[in-house]
UniProtKB/Swiss-Prot annotation:
Pfam families: PP-binding. PANTHER family: ACYL CARRIER PROTEIN (PTHR20863), CARRIER DOMAIN-CONTAINING PROTEIN (PTHR20863:SF76). This is Acyl carrier protein. Residues 2-77 form the Carrier domain. Keywords: Cytoplasm, Fatty acid biosynthesis, Fatty acid metabolism, Lipid biosynthesis, Lipid metabolism, Phosphopantetheine, Phosphoprotein. The modification O-(pantetheine 4'-phosphoryl)serine is found at S37. Pathway: Lipid metabolism; fatty acid biosynthesis. It comes from Methylobacterium radiotolerans (strain ATCC 27329 / DSM 1819 / JCM 2831 / NBRC 15690 / NCIMB 10815 / 0-1). Carrier of the growing fatty acid chain in fatty acid biosynthesis. InterPro entries: ACP, ACP-like_sf, PKS_PP-bd, PP-bd_ACP, Ppantetheine_attach_site.
Amino acid sequence: MSDIAERVKKIVVEHLGVEPEKVVESANFIDDLGADSLDTVELVMAFEEEFNVEIPDDAAETIQTVGDAVKFLEKNSAA
């Protein structure tokens, strides 16, 4: 697992209070991890802060799984 993936996993565990083993690439934030729309906004904000990147609203709407977040951040962050 990449450094970015590990950091994403840590943020998801902290913000959603889920077991680390549930945070897999295919896990959907809402359907699999129990997030609501406010949780997803807070996750995006946490990703922006952790990775020093701005995630536009249209991109944020496409980030629905852990893997989506990792792919976006690998492509767009300098961290």
